[in-house]
A protein has these predicted regions:
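Membrane translocator/pore-forming domains, dominated by Gram-negative outer-membrane beta-barrels
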Residues: 1-7, 11, 19, 67-217
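Long, low-complexity, polar and repeat-rich extracellular regions
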Residues: 1-77, 101
């Protein structure tokens, strides 16, 4: 059960970071478009709160006249999988659904900066006795990118904070034990990449540093 809590914390940071980096990459590829607002949330969420958020975002975006200087976007995600039993942990079935909403704008020097908020629900079944872990996570992420050299080398920066809420149900010797736990997170990423074009080919070498810290009460 302890490892499942750690895995959720790590996965939450990874999802929040990857979503922001993917947004920056998408903008660079489509920067010539007049409207860089984007939605990718046409998913059937099992969680009622996520489903309501998704519907509200789509309706409000259609009805709202966008600011020409600010671009709004949203993205939904679903993930599920299994982890086999090891010498130190029981097998686990993992299911995660989440939604991210964000807004960004261009900065002086052809850079980009923005903020994104992500909410997700994680359901983990541990072992075969009926133990399970439910977790809600909330993350606020600042992201930016700026050209370092011409329009070929970029430095991406991610800084974020998060909160976690665990509801734990453990089955031990036939008895069910319930509890809850809270957590706080801080994380950051620096990524530098360069586009090297030669003939009809493009090579994109990149280096990335990730840091994250989670404190569980």
């Amino acid at each position: 059960m302890a490892l499942a809590q750690i895995e959720i914390a790590n996965r939450t940071i990874a999802h929040s970071t990857d979503t922001a980096l993917n947004r920056l990459k998408w903008i660079r590829r489509n920067k010539d478009l007049q409207d860089l607002s984007y939605q990718n949330i046409k998913l059937n969420f099992s969680n009622q709160m996520l489903a309501s958020l998704s519907e509200a975002i789509q309706i409000s975006t259609k009805e709202k006249e966008k600011d020409d200087d600010i671009f709004y976007w949203a993205e939904g995600s679903l993930a599920f999988g299994k982890v086999k039993e090891t010498d130190t942990s029981s097998k686990k079935k993992i299911y995660t659904d989440g939604i991210t909403i964000g807004a960004d704008k261009f900065t002086v020097g052809d850079g980009i900066k923005g903020l994104a908020f992500r909410f997700s629900q994680n359901d983990v079944k541990v072992g075969t006795a009926g133990s399970k872990l439910d977790a809600n996570t909330y993350n606020l992420t600042y992201y930016s990118t700026a050209p370092v050299k011409d329009d070929r080398r970029f430095l991406d920066t991610i800084i974020g904070v998060g909160a976690l809420r665990y509801d734990i149900s453990s089955v031990l010797d036939g008895s069910k034990l319930n509890g809850n736990r809270n957590g706080r997170q801080i994380y950051g990423t620096l990524k530098i990449k360069e586009e090297i074009k030669k003939d009809d080919h493009t090579l994109i070498p990149a280096a990335q540093i990730d840091l994250g810290y989670t404190l569980l009460s």
